[in-house]
Amino acid sequence: ADPLWIVDGVPGSAPNFNDIESIEILKDAASTAIYGARGAGGVILVTTKKGKIGKLSINARVNFGIETPIDLPDMLHTVDFIDRKLAAGFPNNPNSGWDNPASLPDTDWEDLVWRNAFRQNYFLQMTGGNEKTTFNMSAEFYKNQFIERYSFEDAGNFRVASQTNISKRVKFSEILTVGFNNTDPHLYGQTNNDYVYYRQVPTMVPYDNTNEAGGGWGKHPAGGYYEGPNHVATLMSHHENERRFWARANA
């Protein structure tokens, strides 16, 4: 079972870790004794950062990163592919162009599927206050590419926590958090996974403007054996966008 998150005394979900002031983990009998069945998977108690009396403090951070695919297998070029097909006894279709391999496409499917993925993260936090009011505000945005082309994740959140001393005995505090998440992870099925392209041939092209009936996507010119679906067409035309917006307020 997943743990139960208690954020500033209220059950919720995991907060932005940049906003955490302290964290405590309860498990086993201690968690179930206090929170019942909801705490069966453990309880994580979180206290988030609050405003402090003093001069305005600004904390900013920008991170960049890159992720690159490694140890990809070497794929056959058109000339080597045809040589091995003929050596294995496949018939030389006169319309296939195998007699002149140099005239045929030489598609690098690995380059069309994988990429160097860039990651960006921006964080800004402001804290300050006086005897009357204190506040803590933070905002974060990240934009991530995945190493498979046409897949990504964008997300961001904004949080403000403030406390106002109305009188010596009366205080008003509030915490407001809003955020969003937009991702396209490419969910896979039998014909849509990153290993289909290993079965595609270099003589097949990803795009073909003459193939209007097929949406302009390339197809194998000769056929006669399995060349796999056009994986580039699958990546570009099948999207599984997930968009979430959320808000949480405590007072």
Over which residues does each language-model region extend?
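Transmembrane beta-barrel strand/turn architecture of Gram-negative outer membrane proteins
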Residues: 21, 39-67, 132-211, 235-251
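Short clusters of hydrophobic/aromatic residues that line enzyme substrate/ligand-binding pockets
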Residues: 34-35, 113
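Short beta-turn/strand-loop junction motif enriched in small, turn-promoting residues
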Residues: 10-12, 28-32, 47-49, 142-144
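Periplasmic plug
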Residues: 1-29, 61, 136-138
